[in-house]
Swiss-Prot record:
Entry keyword set: Cytoplasm, Isomerase, Porphyrin biosynthesis, Pyridoxal phosphate
EC number annotated for this UniProt entry: 5.4.3.8
Gene giving rise to this polypeptide: hemL
InterPro entries per UniProt: 4pyrrol_synth_GluAld_NH2Trfase (IPR004639), Aminotrans_3 (IPR005814), Aminotrans_3_PPA_site (IPR049704), PyrdxlP-dep_Trfase (IPR015424), PyrdxlP-dep_Trfase_major (IPR015421), PyrdxlP-dep_Trfase_small (IPR015422)
Subunit comment: Homodimer.
Species this protein is from: Natranaerobius thermophilus (strain ATCC BAA-1301 / DSM 18059 / JW/NM-WN-LF)
Assigned protein family: Belongs to the class-III pyridoxal-phosphate-dependent aminotransferase family. HemL subfamily.
Subcellular location(s) of the protein: Cytoplasm
Protein name: Glutamate-1-semialdehyde 2,1-aminomutase
Amino acid sequence: MRYANSQKYFKTACDLMPGGVNSPARAFSSVESDPLFIKDGSGSKVYDVDDNEYIDYVASYGPLILGHCHPQIRDALKEQIDYGTGYGSPTELENEMAELVIEAVPSIEMVRMVNSGTEATMSALRLARGYTGKNKIVKLTGCYHGHSDSLLIKAGSGVTTLGLPDSPGVPASIAENTITVPYNNLEVMEQVFNKYGDDIAGVILEPVAGNMGVVPPNEGYLEGLRELTSKYGSLLIFDEVMTGFRVSYGGAQAYYGVTPDLTCLGKVIGGGLPVGAYGGKEEIMEYIAPAGSIYQAGTLSGNPIAMRAGIETLKVLRQEGSYDQLESKSKHLAEGLAKVADKNGVSVTINRVGTMVGMYFTEGPVTDFESATSSDNDKFVKYFETMLSEGVYLAPSQFEAMFMSLVHTQEDIEKTIQIADKALSKAAQV
């Protein structure tokens, strides 16, 4: 494949934007290359500015569970634009979206719409502190919750890819109120609560850690967190920005049967547009202004364009058989990758929950940040290069998931496995 136009546009972008991108995860620095510039997407495919076609498993880093340019979403957006893009006033669409979310997510009795996952998580922390009257937040090492100061500490996603333990610019006075604990380790969590429990406002985590690849919770782990937080009067906060409506219609909490106090959403609920939400028990959410005294606001929160896209997305997903299809396709992909890895003598660990698939170049098991980062990056780089050159678009980091969509075909999956066979044979030589 040729990438001349992508390289040209990236060179220009580097003079205009820090690192040439508007989000670090999009840079190809960890795979020693320049990023693709995409001009078009349709169904399960994307097309770059050099007219190369790719089977897409990035899915805009998760939101596009219906694929690119889904006709129902496209037509709804075209219709909505004729009525206006925003009013700064409440709309019936916000009610409809809220009803769909509340109906689907077990923990949510009341919801507030925002514009991003970062807004959702930072607002949830403020609410947890205001509601409990406590100061400290516990987060899990390798879990990424956006770029707000309180949470950009031992985070995953691009922070892990770039090898940054945290970020300059986060004041020590803020960092000292964030306690980090290894993922999947209840013993250490209990020790932290024994020491700081009287001042812990909440524990926030990705119930499936999707920003250090795909790391599911050990059996009993989420239940243990639920019991521990309840014992100390702290809130359990699930960051389901990635897992919400992706691992099941009710998210990871429905999948695992553990109900948090607060839930953060994003990605899928916007149908590809910028959106976020946080919600939970009514008695907690009523602390948010104007019902209560904890302030949070947004000029574009609940805007009709994002609401319309989200509504149409959820209507498609709740149709009978949608998640059966997604499960079948995702299982086929994961099992196929494992088979060709074994064929080529490459030690990999493949973790999957619902439509999220993660592959690590390590014998595993991968259960936390330490084991995730033991993956062989040199092997991943060779694998990534071959997959890309043969027409499969993966995130340029081994710490991002592959995302399945409803529009990926069996042909797409079989072709992906065939190309992975070739890519793994090359990775085996590294």
